[in-house]
Structures are given as structure tokens and as C-alpha cells.
């Protein structure tokens, strides 16, 4: 089964909790705080594996959660950081944030890595909070929650040559005649519903050819599963445009040529500049010669290779022409990269989160914001000292003043995430 797009959930591991502990050895007078820090949570890391060819495994496992860090211990022992969760993906995988639609990573080379969800940092133990005014604090932090999000994974096949054209123009027949690939071939449209790959061996050189499902008018807008098919064209170095010059289905070959190129350009403007070889197929049929003459009159500057994929006439010459053209093209097509391929691990800079905002939910004041909600999750509210520290942090952030301006009075309910408490003047 060929699967080229899936939606999955990823979550970095939570950081370990910091510890509250004090030294009590016999010969260590006034030993002081000795609670260790929690360990770093594991990252979810995607790594390219050339042995994979499809995203089918992700249809059955759609949740990836990295392990959390160890908790801090006594005697200032820090918890161990968790191991990363390594997920292997096929080359050509693009990872997109489902919320923002931002491209997180573009994974193309064997061994290339990208951090998709970062693990949370470990919480600090009480020895981190000791100072001259509070030499024996009973304060520690919970571990920071790991980053979590839904992502869309898209697989764009990496092939040297992509065969494009209307349905039933002979692309699959051509691929099967020059490679060991066995695509389904039948006398009806959309016989090919998934891309087929084959290797063309020319002796001293070879290249990978992809038979892409047929395109129709409106493909750039998704008509006829156009988006699913067109994404695979983006990574090909050379486009081989196959035309049914015999017009078996009654279409005009020249209009077919214009329409397919229009769809490619509308889907991705960069495809307009991608090298292209035009192939007139089905030349064994009687109508083909006259149609080819008319085509050349309308497009005199377009070099056309005449073949019959069914009888193999002209096919060998076409393959050598493709090989010669590939020799003049860079190994990688011009695609929009998220990061340089040489960069083995990709981290994306995070913008500073908004501090907070306050809304009303009936009689409840709801304080929300990434920064304030993270502060709640990392505060050990079972500790009186930690709760007092949290109250001071809220005041310093301006939450108390903002609540008063909105009319909060003593005893009103305030909610931050899952925490509810009474407002105190």
C-alpha cells in the first residue's frame, strides 16, 4: 500500500521534577538544601532511512511520545535526561505543523535529522533556591511539559525523472518497457492511482524514473486528486511530458500540452523553469502523424521525441536523450528548504510567548497564555513556599493589577489552565 500523507500527534517528554531534600549526615552541620534537579525530557526526532519508501507505518501508529526525564534525588543528585524517541521516515518527507501550516522540516538525505517536538527541561531542586534571606527553602519546580502538536507528514518521491501527462497517454507502458517496474496497465482512465518507480540502466549511468498518476484540468486545485499527484513532481530533476499524439480520447494534443504545463505552474511556480522533455507517444497509430505536424506548427520551438511505447520504437533514443539531459542538471532540484541539508539537526527558534490575557467565563476570570500556564504547570502547589513564590511571580507579571482593573474582588474565582483559586486583595 502506498501512503503519501498522514496526520500524527507528537509530544516531547516532560522534564523530571526537582526534589526537596536536606543533608542530614552526622558530620555535616547545617548541611542545607540538597534537592537535585530533574532530568531533561526526550525529544521526538525524525531521521531519514533510505530503506523506507512509504508512510504506511504511520497509518497504524499515529501517536509518538518521548519519555520523561528522571526526577531529582537527595544529596543534590540530578535526574538523568531521557533518551530521544527516534522515528525513521522515508527520504522526501516534509513535516508541517497542522495548526500554523508552517514547514517544520524537509527531510531528503540519508541520516538527516530534525527535532519535531522538544522535550521539557527538568525542574530545579531546592538547592537552586537557597539565598541569604532563605537559606533552607522548601521550594522545587515540576518538570517543564514537553512540546506537543499535531503534524502532517507529506511524502514527495525523490526521482530523477517524472512522467507527467493526461490519463491514458502511455506513461505506465513507457515505464514498464524501460524498467523492471510492473505498473497496472488497462484501457481506462486513472489506472495508475499511486506513483510507480523504476530504474533505467544505460550501462555506465542510470536514473530513477517515476510514473505519476494522470493529471486533469484543475489538478492544481485538487481536482482528480491533483494535489496528491503534483507534490511528487516537485522533487524530480527532469519532467518528461508524455502526450497522446494519436488523440485516442478525442482531445487536442497541443491543448493537452498547454493545459498540463498550466497545471504544473499554477501548483508551483518553480516548476515552470524545471527542465522538460516533450514526448509524442502512440506514433504507431495513423492519426498521430497529422496531429504531430499540427503540433509542430503551433509549437515550432519545442523539440519533440517521437516514440511508440507499445512497440518500443524510438524509446531507446529517448532514454539516452534523458540521460544526456540529466548530466547537465544539478543533482538536486530547486526546492524550498527549511534548513541546509548539511545541518544534521534542525532546531527552530521559538518566539517569546505572550505573558497572559484575561477573559470572563460567567463569574470566573480566566487567565490564559503560554507563559503563565507553563508557570502553573511547573509550580509544585503542594508546597506552601512554592505557592507563595507563584503568587509573587503573578504580581510581578502584572496579573493581579490586570484582574483588579477588570473588576476582580476579594473571593472571586480565577482560573489558569486546570488551576482554580480565589482572588485575594
From Swiss-Prot:
Its cofactor is Mg(2+). It comes from Brevibacillus brevis (strain 47 / JCM 6285 / NBRC 100599). It comes from the Bacteria. Residues 159-327 form the OBG-type G domain. ATP binds at residues 165-172, 190-194, 211-214, 281-284, 308-310. GO terms for biological process: ribosome biogenesis. An essential GTPase which binds GTP, GDP and possibly (p)ppGpp with moderate affinity, with high nucleotide exchange rates and a fairly low GTP hydrolysis rate. Plays a role in control of the cell cycle, stress response, ribosome biogenesis and in those bacteria that undergo differentiation, in morphogenesis control. One of its GO terms (cellular component) is cytoplasm. Keywords: ATP-binding, Cytoplasm, GTP-binding, Hydrolase, Magnesium, Metal-binding, Nucleotide-binding. This is GTPase Obg. Its EC number is 3.6.5.-. Pfam families: DUF1967, GTP1_OBG, MMR_HSR1.
